């Protein structure tokens, strides 16, 4: 019995001893863990300089300051990022598109010529020097900020005269027409042998050429093909256009005076001709009885045409047959354009009555003088698919000479100020399905033309007139959104008489310093202007082809006046030598 109790007691002592050692072990482990943790914390505090609770209070402030610095840095770089985006996403693709357009135009022209060569119908293609690639038919000055009139023409520059002049005192060269494409230019004028007022016989000079740059860097126009159309056909009022097949020309054929033509009952004969790259001229009469069935007189606008969407577009004008469908649809329609800051004082009802009567001047027997646009498909067949567009007289003034221009992707119609409105007009034009639509015009108040009273240069009220002179403006300065800002042109700076030719840059209300041809008493007549850029030097030039009085050899001499467009804020006046 005692032995059994002793055995139990021994086992209990052993169990208690084991538990005691387990407790000691656990306490030792816990102590070592705490010591290790304390040492680790101490090491961390020492090595990292860890903040105390008081230090942690300032952390949000430091974070805010760092955030402000980062924001400031990003903000200063935003302008750079924006410029990079504009260059990469906007300007570079646009520049590539312009280059692509130029290349495609050249390829189109070459393809026409290759086909012509295959058919033994043409020679090789003339093309401007590489210095001009991308500088013809483009928006030459794109500037949102500068004053338009801070751009101005230099004195006239000496260059090669590519226009033949009269060789006798009775000779007469008149009515120049000019157009230039990305590959070549076209020029024509009328030649009369016995004085400028002879309507019975004349011949037409027609030339094709290219822009060259001389070894010294001068611009010159090089004529490569030309022809004198001296036959039994009396071509008048011719307009020319540079197309992929050469120089397309639209002319009327007349044997009577203008007044007699308007008093006739049938439309005027009209022909579509072409000077090809091989120097050969071909021509085809249009079916005017169908095309101009409602007209008693019809003439090209004299100014150059334009090649758009595989068609050549010309401005035309003339007289409508009374009570014909085309005449009836215009009945009661009119438009009144107003001078800048110079309102007509007449009563509104009287102004409307005068505006309506301005379309039927007495000089042409009371016929409605109408503006129109003729487009013809450009192909190896002449006169193909002609389409006539007659715009409403709620947009256009009385019909007059004009010009179709293409600059960049924009098209315009210039209308001569033959009616009461003296400032130069450029109607924006859109084309679709072979027809054209005209929109409210840009007006250039300081770009006036002389005229007979009551439609002189300073006129401000509607009146029936047939006056003025052809002096077209060329679109030169644009906003970045392609809106037109300013034009270049050579005006006749007289009130009533055709005197004082002067070149300038014009905005809607004013003009730059001017470059005069000579004295204020110099007689002149028609002027037509075209601008281009020498891309290599980034210099912009403008050519004004002007009829200048010539007392020794003929009444007029047609002179190609060349200027460079300069820029500053001066107001001096330049004069040619």
Swiss-Prot record:
GO terms for biological process: symbiont entry into host cell; virion attachment to host cell. Glycans are attached at residues 119, 341, 433, 481, 538. The keyword Membrane applies. It is found in: Virion membrane; Host cell membrane. It is an enzyme of class 3 (hydrolase). GO terms for cellular component: host cell plasma membrane; membrane; viral envelope; virion membrane. CDD domains: HN (cd15469). Residues 1-26 are intravirion. It is a single-pass type II membrane protein. Its EC number is 3.2.1.18. Residues 234-239 are annotated as: Involved in neuraminidase activity. Disulfide bonds join 172-196, 186-247, 238-251, 344-461, 455-465, 531-542. The chain crosses the membrane at residues 27-47. One of its GO terms (molecular function) is exo-alpha-sialidase activity. Residues 48-577 are virion surface. Residues 124-152 are annotated as: Important for interaction with fusion/F protein. InterPro entries: Hemagglutn-neuramid, Hemagglutn/HN, Sialidase_sf. It catalyses: Hydrolysis of alpha-(2->3)-, alpha-(2->6)-, alpha-(2->8)- glycosidic linkages of terminal sialic acid residues in oligosaccharides, glycoproteins, glycolipids, colominic acid and synthetic substrates. Pfam families: HN. The C-terminus (head domain) is involved in binding the cellular receptor. Belongs to the paramyxoviruses hemagglutinin-neuraminidase family. Homotetramer; composed of disulfide-linked homodimers. Interacts with F protein trimer. Interacts with host CG-1B; this interaction inhibits viral adsorption and replication rather than internalization. Mediates the viral entry into the host cell together with fusion/F protein. Attaches the virus to sialic acid-containing cell receptors and thereby initiates infection. Binding of HN protein to the receptor induces a conformational change that allows the F protein to trigger virion/cell membranes fusion. This is Hemagglutinin-neuraminidase. The lineage of its organism: Viruses, Riboviria, Orthornavirae, Negarnaviricota, Haploviricotina. The gene is HN.
């Amino acid at each position: 019995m005692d032995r059994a109790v002793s055995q139990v007691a021994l086992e209990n002592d052993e169990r208690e001893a084991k538990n005691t050692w387990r407790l000691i072990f656990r306490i030792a482990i816990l102590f070592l863990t705490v010591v290790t943790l304390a040492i680790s914390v101490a090491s961390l505090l020492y090595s990292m300089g860890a903040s105390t609770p008081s230090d942690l209070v300032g952390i949000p402030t430091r974070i805010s300051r760092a955030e402000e610095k980062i924001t400031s840095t990003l903000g200063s770089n935003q302008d750079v990022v924006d410029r990079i985006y504009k260059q990469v996403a906007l300007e570079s693709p646009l520049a590539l598109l312009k280059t692509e357009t130029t290349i495609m135009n050249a390829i189109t022209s070459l393809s026409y010529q290759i086909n012509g060569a295959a058919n033994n119908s043409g020679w090789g293609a003339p093309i401007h020097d590489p210095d001009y690639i991308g500088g013809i038919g483009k928006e030459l000055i794109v500037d949102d900020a500068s004053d338009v009139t801070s751009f101005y023409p230099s004195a006239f520059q000496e260059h090669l005269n590519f226009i033949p002049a009269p060789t006798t005192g009775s000779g007469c060269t008149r009515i120049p027409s000019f157009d230039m494409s990305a590959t070549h230019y076209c020029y024509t004028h009328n030649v009369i042998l016995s004085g400028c007022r002879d309507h019975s016989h004349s011949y037409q000079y027609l030339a094709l050429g290219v822009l060259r740059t001389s070894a010294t860097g001068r611009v010159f126009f090089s004529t490569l093909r030309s022809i004198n159309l001296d036959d039994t056909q009396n071509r008048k009022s011719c307009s020319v256009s540079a197309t992929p097949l050469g120089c397309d020309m639209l002319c009327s054929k007349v044997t009577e005076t203008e007044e007699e033509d308007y008093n006739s009952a049938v439309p005027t004969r009209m022909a579509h001709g072409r000077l090809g790259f091989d120097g050969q001229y071909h021509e085809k009469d249009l079916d005017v009885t169908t095309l101009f069935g409602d007209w008693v007189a019809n003439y090209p606008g004299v100014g150059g045409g334009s090649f758009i969407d595989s068609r050549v577009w010309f401005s035309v004008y003339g007289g409508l047959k009374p009570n014909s469908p085309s005449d009836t649809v215009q009945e009661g329609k009119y438009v009144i354009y107003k001078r800048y800051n110079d309102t007509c004082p007449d009563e509104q009802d009287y102004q409307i009555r005068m505006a309506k009567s301005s379309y039927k001047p007495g000089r042409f027997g009371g016929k409605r003088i109408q503006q129109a646009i003729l487009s013809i498909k450009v192909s190896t067949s002449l006169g193909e698919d002609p389409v006539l567009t007659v715009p409403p007289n709620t947009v256009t003034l009385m019909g007059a000479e004009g010009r179709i221009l293409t600059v960049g992707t924009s098209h315009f119609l210039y209308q001569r100020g033959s009616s009461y409105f003296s400032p130069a007009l450029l109607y924006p034009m859109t084309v679709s399905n072979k027809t054209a639509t005209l929109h409210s015009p840009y007006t250039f108040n300081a770009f006036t033309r002389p005229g007979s009273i009551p439609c002189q240069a300073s006129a401000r009220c509607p009146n029936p007139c047939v006056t003025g002179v052809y002096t077209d403006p060329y679109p030169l300065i644009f906003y970045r959104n392609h809106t037109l800002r300013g034009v270049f042109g050579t005006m006749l700076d007289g009130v009533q008489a055709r005197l004082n030719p002067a070149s300038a840059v014009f905005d809607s209300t004013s003009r730059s310093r001017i470059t005069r041809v000579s004295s204020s008493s110099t007689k002149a007549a028609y002027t037509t202007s075209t601008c281009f850029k020498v891309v290599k030097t980034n210099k912009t030039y403008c050519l004004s082809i002007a009829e200048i009085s010539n007392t020794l050899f003929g009444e007029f001499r047609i002179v190609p006046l060349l200027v460079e467009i300069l820029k500053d804020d001066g107001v001096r006046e330049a004069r040619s030598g």
